[in-house]
Every structure is written in structure tokens, then in C-alpha cells.
UniProtKB/Swiss-Prot annotation:
Keywords: Cytoplasm, Metal-binding, tRNA processing, Zinc. This is Queuine tRNA-ribosyltransferase accessory subunit 2. GO terms for biological process: maintenance of translational fidelity; tRNA-guanine transglycosylation. It comes from Schizosaccharomyces pombe (strain 972 / ATCC 24843). Its main location: cytoplasm. InterPro entries: QTRTD1 (IPR028592), Queuine_tRNA-ribosyltrfase (IPR050852), TGT-like_sf (IPR036511), tRNA_ribo_trans-like (IPR002616). Coiled coil: none annotated. Zn(2+) binds at residues 307, 309, 312, 338. The gene is qtr2. Heterodimer of a catalytic subunit and an accessory subunit. Binds 1 zinc ion per subunit. Non-catalytic subunit of the queuine tRNA-ribosyltransferase (TGT) that catalyzes the base-exchange of a guanine (G) residue with queuine (Q) at position 34 (anticodon wobble position) in tRNAs with GU(N) anticodons (tRNA-Asp, -Asn, -His and -Tyr), resulting in the hypermodified nucleoside queuosine (7-(((4,5-cis-dihydroxy-2-cyclopenten-1-yl)amino)methyl)-7-deazaguanosine). Its cofactor is Zn(2+). GO terms for cellular component: cytoplasm.
Length: 441
């Protein structure tokens, strides 16, 4: 999977990566899944898009660790998530945006499943990889959810090397060695701490079977012999501009959560790349449209002008807003269909811009023309599950109540007085009650 690239002056590069029998043109994005499925989309809808690969976080499916159905039932990961046979999958220990968890140990990391916090050992993770047979895999890694201390940093690197070595040895002993490619997890640490990783690539013969590098945040300076490997980023992106900046630093593959986050919020993505010519009014353009907004109640335009996705070809903004107001599930389906298509077109434009040698200039124009963040949503998205919410601190209520009291202020006051009167009567009854005397026999 070595990458042969055409680069821009900043470091952005365009190439192709072969995964099994599929050629992935980079830069590209892998679509994150939730509990093994693409949110809001059925498998037949997913097949309509040319999605390079699906990202599956194993912690989504390990409610009972080794007794979880994903490990006890027959079949590979393709059968579990009902993905097409030609659709590559990337298996990783955690979700793209994992919830905070306790620090890892020498042989395990802590994960957050639908049934609570669990310890995922490297032995169990290797067993899952050998059973599920994904095309791509990120080994178990100690990625802290808060800044690590000085003593922990060397341990993070040591665990990455040891756990990756154990996975490679297990793959080598089976037929999966030629079908499952490994992305080495590079910790987000200063280069001085990464020396053991660089030594691993220089001295260990197993390093020849590393297919790429996975970064959780910043891209560290790399030795010359590692520059040709594909680079994947799992960091959290808040805007498309952050993605463009990341590609400028040399990242080839992005795993963005913002597609589903925008859909959940009821936002239709409307940005494009390369960007359009600057508005004569000198005002910045929105990255998306909040479809809860009342201004779309009678708007008979498609979600995005010129878009040819299934949603924009058949439906209008007013209809999508009506579905959102009615809390119809199809509202989020239509938005997700459009947003995935918009992201696919976004990356097609990125590759074309790099090939033409205009990428850095187009990024500068994009920053000038578009707003830096998505519009605030005025509605409620689908109800969230416990494993989607940060429960480590006191957080605002994520799921609004399904009903509210219709009592007037006067009715509430009368009800409160009535409850207070009942409490007073119970106290008086208790005080008047005398326990029978006990007589000695």
C-alpha cells in the first residue's frame, strides 16, 4: 500500500491506494459507523455511494466482551454490518470520538460500551480481528482522552509497539496476513518520544507488513523511509476548513464525524471545493443550512443549488423542513443522503485542485469566502444513547422531555398547596399515634 503521490508545495498529495480489489483515490474519507451501521442509511442506500471504506469501532459491539454476539456468531465483519462484499472496512478498538475513560494498563485499554465501561485486552482484540477479517485494522493503542503526564508518555509508545507486534505475529500465523492490512497507531506526542517507533520500522522485519500510519491528532515529522506510507487521521474535525488544513499537512485519509453530526442537527451541507467566486456583497457564505429555520417553510428550492443527489433531485427545502417538524425519520434519511453526497463531491474537488496545482490558493479562498463554523441548530435531533454522551461530568440534558405540563400557573400553585397540605396531615397523624405499651409477663 505504499503511496506514490503528486504533491502541492504545502504537503497535500494525491495518489491511489489499493485495498483488496478496490482502488481508493486519495485524499479520501472513510465513513464512520455507529454500532456497525451508517447512521440513518440502510445498506442499499450505502451501496449507491462510492464510499472508499467504512470505519467500525469495535467498542460499539462489545457489550459483553468475549460473549458479545459479534464474536459468538458465525461470519466476518461484512456479514455483521451487512456491507457489500466489495466494500472495504477499517476495524479500530474505539469510536472516532471516544468518550473519556480510565487510563490503560499494560495489557488492556478501557472502552465505553452500551452496557458500561469494560476492559479490552490485546488478546481479545486480536481474537476479534482474526474472526472478523477486516481489510484494514488499527492495532490496540493507548490513546489518552486527556493530556498525558511525563511518566505515561513513554508507556504509550511502548504499548503501541508491543501490541502492534503481537497483532502482526498473530496475523502471520494465519491466512489473514495477506488479506488484513495494518495501520500503525502513531501517538500524538513530541518526536523525541517516538524514537522506539522509528526503531521498530528500521529493525523489525514485521514492519514491512505495515500498510499505513494512523494519527489521532497532529502529524509528526517522519523519517524519509516512512514518508511514502498512507496517512490516516482520526482526529475530531469541527469544520471543513480544518480538514483542508489537515490535508495540507500531508494526511491522505480522513474519518469525519461531522457528516452525521450535521444530519442529526438538521443541517444540510452546502459548501463546495474549489470555492465559488467571492460574493459582491463581501459577506461570508454559510457552510450549511439549518433546515429547522422557518424561512424554509415555503422554500421550493433544492437543499443545494446544482446538487444532483437523490434528495435534491426529488424533494424541496420546505418538504424536508416539514418532515423535521413532524419528527419523521425520513427527514434525517434525506439529509444524510445529501450530506454524504456533498462530502463525496468535496473530496473530488480536493483531488482535482491538487492535480491542477491550485490547492493552497483554493484553501486560502475557501477560508475567505466561507464561515468558520456550521449554523446553530434550532431543533432537536434523534434521541441520544448513553454511550453517545459524556457522563464523566455534569452535562446539560441531551434528550428533551417528550411532553410538558399544560397546567396554568394558578393550577400549579393550587396543586403545590394541596401536596403541602397532605404532607402536613401525615405529620400530624404520626404525632398523634402512641405506640402500645409493652407489659412484662
Amino acid at each position: 500500500m505504499a503511496i506514490s503521490s503528486l504533491s502541492s508545495p504545502s504537503g497535500a498529495r494525491v495518489s491511489s491506494v489499493t485495498v483488496k480489489n478496490k482502488v481508493l483515490k486519495t485524499p479520501c474519507f472513510f465513513l464512520p459507523t455507529s454500532r456497525g451501521t451508517v447512521p440513518h442509511l440502510t445498506p442499499d442506500n450505502v451501496e449507491e455511494f462510492d464510499i472508499p471504506a467504512l470505519y467500525v469501532g469495535l467498542e460499539d459491539c462489545l457489550d459483553r466482551l468475549e460473549a458479545s454476539p459479534i464474536l459468538t456468531n458465525e461470519g466476518t465483519i461484512k456479514k455483521w454490518i451487512a456491507a457489500p462484499s466489495v466494500q472495504p472496512t477499517l476495524l479500530a478498538p474505539r469510536r472516532t470520538s471516544p468518550l473519556p475513560s480510565v487510563s490503560a494498563g499494560q495489557s488492556h485499554i478501557n472502552i465505553v460500551t452500551a452496557s458500561g465501561a469494560k476492559k479490552l485486552t490485546n488478546d481479545l482484540y486480536i481474537k476479534a480481528v482474526l474472526k472478523l477479517c477486516p481489510e484494514l485494522v488499527i492495532p490496540l493503542n493507548d490513546t489518552p482522552t486527556s493530556p498525558p503526564g511525563v511518566k505515561r508518555k513513554p508507556k504509550i509508545v511502548e504499548r503501541s509497539v508491543n501490541w502492534t507486534t503481537e497483532l502482526l505475529l498473530a496475523l502471520k500465523a494465519t491466512d489473514a496476513f495477506n488479506t488484513t492490512k495494518v495501520f500503525f497507531p502513531v501517538p500524538d506526542l513530541d518526536t523525541q518520544y517516538l524514537t522506539p517507533i522509528f526503531q521498530f520500522f528500521q529493525e523489525n522485519q514485521l514492519a514491512n507488513n505495515i500498510a499505513g500510519l494512523a494519527f489521532s491528532n497532529n502529524v509528526n515529522p517522519l523519517p524519509a523511509d516512512l514518508v511514502g506510507l498512507p496517512r490516516l487521521s482520526i482526529q475530531k474535525f469541527e469544520s471543513p476548513l480544518e480538514i483542508l488544513k489537515c490535508i495540507q499537512r500531508g494526511i491522505d485519509i480522513i474519518v469525519p464525524d461531522m457528516i452525521t453530526q450535521a444530519t442529526d442537527a438538521g443541517v444540510a451541507l452546502t459548501f463546495s471545493f474549489p470555492p465559488p467566486s467571492k460574493d459582491v456583497l463581501n459577506s461570508k457564505i454559510e457552510l450549511g443550512l439549518d433546515m429547522w429555520d422557518e424561512r424554509f417553510a415555503t422554500d421550493m428550492e433544492p437543499l443545494q443549488s446544482g446538487c444532483v443527489c437523490k434528495t435534491c433531485r426529488r424533494y424541496k427545502r420546505a418538504y424536508v423542513r416539514h418532515l423535521l417538524q413532524a419528527r419523521e425519520l425520513v427527514a434525517w434519511i434525506l439529509l444524510q443522503l445529501h450530506n454524504v453526497y456533498a462530502f463525496t463531491a468535496f473530496f473530488q474537488g480536493i483531488r482535482a485542485s491538487i492535480q491542477e496545482g491550485n490547492f493552497d490558493e483554493d484553501v486560502r479562498k475557501f477560508e475567505e469566502i466561507y464561515m468558520t463554523s456550521f449554523p446553530a441548530s434550532h431543533g432537536f435531533g434523534p434521541r441520544k444513547r448513553g454511550y453517545q454522551m459524556d457522563l464523566t461530568n455534569v452535562q446539560p440534558v441531551e434528550n428533551k422531555p417528550a411532553w410538558i405540563s399544560m397546567k396554568s400557573p394558578l393550577e400549579k400553585e393550587i396543586a403545590n398547596e394541596y401536596e403541602a397540605l397532605k404532607v402536613t396531615e401525615r405529620k400530624e397523624d404520626t404525632q398523634d399515634y402512641n405506640e402500645p405499651e409493652l407489659h412484662n409477663r
